């Protein structure tokens, strides 16, 4: 039986495979990385293989990555992408469920003007 970490990695590989297969208009991918204590997000451009913007609870000097701080991270990344005039994105949960901290981050990003 596979461990939870292996299962999450396999789910994430499937998600990335689907994103690459269906992302024909080369939208930016918001990739969420969740650890036990912190949360971070990167805006990837898969066509050029570069990170356009990133934000994390560590970079914002937040104490932890709880739901309130995840909202702040979502607002920060949304502000950075709106400044770059990138509003249409694809959201990648990183193999985790769309629940809790990840949902809070996504909703905060939507409120600031991102479409996904």
From Swiss-Prot:
Q: Is RNA-binding a UniProt keyword of this protein?
A: yes
User: Which portions of this protein are annotated as coiled-coil regions?
Assistant: none
Top-rank taxon of the source lineage equals Bacteria
Q: Name one Pfam family in it.
A: Ribosomal_L18p
NCBIfam families (UniProt xref): L18_bact (TIGR00060)
Subunit note: Part of the 50S ribosomal subunit; part of the 5S rRNA/L5/L18/L25 subcomplex. Contacts the 5S and 23S rRNAs.
The protein's name in its UniProt record: Large ribosomal subunit protein uL18
Q: Whose protein is this, by species? A: Mycoplasma pneumoniae (strain ATCC 29342 / M129 / Subtype 1)
């Amino acid at each position: 039986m596979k461990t939870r970490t292996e299962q999450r990695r396999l789910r994430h590989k499937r998600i990335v495979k689907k994103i690459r297969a269906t992302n024909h208009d080369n939208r930016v991918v918001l990739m969420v990385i969740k650890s036990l204590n912190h949360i971070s997000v990167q805006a990837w451009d898969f066509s050029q293989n570069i990170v356009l913007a990133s934000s994390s609870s560590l970079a914002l000097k937040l104490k932890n990555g709880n739901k309130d701080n995840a909202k702040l991270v979502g607002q920060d990344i949304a502000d950075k992408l709106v400044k770059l005039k990138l509003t249409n994105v694809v959201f990648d949960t990183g193999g985790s469920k769309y629940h809790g901290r990840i949902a809070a981050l996504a909703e905060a990003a939507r409120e600031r003007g991102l479409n996904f």
